[in-house]
C-alpha cells in the first residue's frame, strides 16, 4: 500500500442535529453558525472535517432561498474550507402514501431541494452527494394495507426520481423503523425495487439499520435471535453481514453513527434508532469495524459507492452538542473509518 494517507471518503458533519427533536416541547434549536463553528474547529492530529451535509429546513435554511442567498452561503462555506454533500429534503408535509395533494407536495419539495443542490454545484461547493428522502408516513398507517401502500409510496418516489433526474440528482431513502414502507429491511428493499428507477437508492445509517436487526416494528423481519446477548459479537457480525449483503447494493449514501440497541424520540420526533455519542460506553457497534460491512463488498473490496460519509447524531442534549470535545471525538471515530476503509486519490 502506498504511504499516502487516505483522503477519501471525505468526512462530513451534519447540520440537522441542531434542529431534529428540538423545538417548543424540547430544547431550542442550535444555530447554523454555531454548528459551522464547531465543525470547523474540530481537529484531530491535524485532520479536519472536509464538509457538511445540510437539512434544508427552518431555522437553518429557506428551501426557496434566492440564487444570491445560496451563492452567499456557498461563499461562506468555501471560506471555511468546507464543501457541501447530501441534502435532506423537507418532505414531511406530504406523506408519500397520502392523498394526491400530499403526494404532489412531496414531489415539489424534492424538486425545490434539487434546485438548491444544483445551485450549490454551480457555485462550486458541492462535488458529491444525494437528496435524502423518507416516506413521511407512519408504519401503523402503512400496515393497514401493505401491498397498496408500498405501491403508492413507490409511485411517489418514482415521480420524485424523474423530477430529480432533470437536475442530475439521485434520491436516497433513509431506512428507519419510524417510516412506513421503510420500517424493516425487507419492506425497504421491496419499496426500492418497486420504484424501478436508476436514480433511487438507500441511505444507510449505522444506528437505524442496527434496529432492522431487531425487527423493531416488524417482528417477522427480525434477524438477531430473541433475547440476543450483545456480547455475542459473532452473531451480531453474522446479522450485519446478512443485512448489508441485502442493502449494500442499493446504498448511495452513508451515516456513521453509534447506537445502544434502543429507540428514542424527543420533541415532535417519532421513536427511532437512538443515536449515541461516538464514545458512548453502551454503544453496541464497533464503529470502524462495522462501517466496513457497508463500505466493502463480501470479497473485501471497497465499493467506493459514495465520495463522502457523514456523521449523524440526533437528539443529543444541547449541552453535549455545544461542547467542542463532542465533535473532536466524532471526527476521531470517522478518521478511523477512513483509515480502515478509505482510499487515496490525487487531487
Question: Residue spans of the language-model regions?
Answer:
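N-terminal pre-domain/capping segments
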Residues: 1-127, 148, 158-159, 165, ...
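Aromatic-rich peripheral "rim/lid" segments of glycoside hydrolase catalytic domains that contact
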Residues: 270-271, 276-287, 310-347
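Active-site groove signature of glycoside hydrolases
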Residues: 117-146, 167-178, 311
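Hydrophobic faces of well-ordered beta-strands that scaffold small-molecule active sites
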Residues: 7-14, 50-54, 84-89, 129-133, ...
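Acidic/histidine-rich catalytic cores of soluble enzymes
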Residues: 154-276
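A short, acidic, amphipathic alpha-helical segment used as a generic capping/interface helix at domain edges
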Residues: 37, 237-243, 281-304
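Active-site beta-loop-alpha junctions enriched in small/polar residues
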Residues: 14-18, 54-57, 89-92, 136-138, ...
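Active-site cleft segment of glycoside hydrolase catalytic domains centered on the general acid/base Glu
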Residues: 139-157, 163-164
Amino acid at each position: 500500500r502506498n504511504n499516502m494517507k487516505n483522503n477519501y471518503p471525505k468526512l462530513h458533519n451534519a447540520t440537522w442535529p441542531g434542529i431534529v427533536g428540538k423545538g417548543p416541547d424540547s430544547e431550542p434549536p442550535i444555530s447554523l453558525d454555531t454548528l459551522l463553528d464547531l465543525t470547523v474547529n474540530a481537529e484531530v492530529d491535524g485532520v479536519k472535517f472536509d464538509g457538511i451535509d445540510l437539512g434544508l429546513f427552518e431555522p437553518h435554511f429557506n428551501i426557496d432561498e434566492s440564487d444570491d442567498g445560496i451563492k452567499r452561503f456557498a461563499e461562506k462555506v468555501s471560506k471555511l474550507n468546507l464543501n457541501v454533500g447530501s441534502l435532506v429534503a423537507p418532505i414531511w408535509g406530504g406523506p408519500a402514501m397520502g392523498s394526491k395533494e400530499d403526494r404532489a407536495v412531496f414531489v415539489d419539495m424534492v424538486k425545490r431541494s434539487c434546485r438548491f443542490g444544483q445551485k450549490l454545484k454551480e457555485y462550486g461547493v458541492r462535488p458529491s452527494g444525494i437528496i435524502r428522502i423518507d416516506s413521511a408516513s407512519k408504519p401503523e398507517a402503512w400496515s393497514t394495507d401493505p401491498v397498496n401502500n408500498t405501491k403508492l409510496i413507490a409511485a411517489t418516489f418514482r415521480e420524485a426520481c424523474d423530477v430529480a433526474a432533470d437536475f442530475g440528482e439521485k434520491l436516497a431513502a433513509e431506512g428507519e423503523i419510524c417510516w412506513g414502507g421503510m420500517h424493516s429491511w425487507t419492506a425497504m428493499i421491496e419499496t426500492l425495487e418497486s420504484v424501478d428507477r436508476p436514480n433511487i437508492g438507500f441511505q444507510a445509517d449505522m444506528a437505524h439499520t442496527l434496529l432492522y436487526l431487531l425487527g423493531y416494528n416488524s417482528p417477522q423481519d427480525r434477524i438477531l435471535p430473541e433475547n440476543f446477548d450483545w456480547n455475542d459479537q459473532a452473531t451480531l457480525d453474522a446479522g450485519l453481514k446478512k443485512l448489508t449483503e441485502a442493502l449494500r447494493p442499493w446504498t448511495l449514501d452513508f451515516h456513521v453513527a453509534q447506537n445502544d440497541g434502543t429507540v428514542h424520540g424527543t420533541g415532535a420526533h417519532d421513536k427511532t434508532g437512538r443515536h449515541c455519542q461516538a464514545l458512548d460506553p453502551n454503544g453496541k457497534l464497533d464503529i470502524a469495524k462495522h462501517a466496513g460491512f457497508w463500505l466493502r463488498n463480501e470479497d473485501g473490496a471497497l465499493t467506493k459507492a459514495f465520495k463522502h460519509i457523514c456523521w449523524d447524531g440526533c437528539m443529543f442534549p444541547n449541552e453535549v452538542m455545544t461542547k467542542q470535545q463532542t465533535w473532536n471525538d466524532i471526527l476521531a471515530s470517522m478518521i478511523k473509518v477512513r483509515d480502515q476503509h478509505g482510499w487515496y486519490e490525487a487531487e
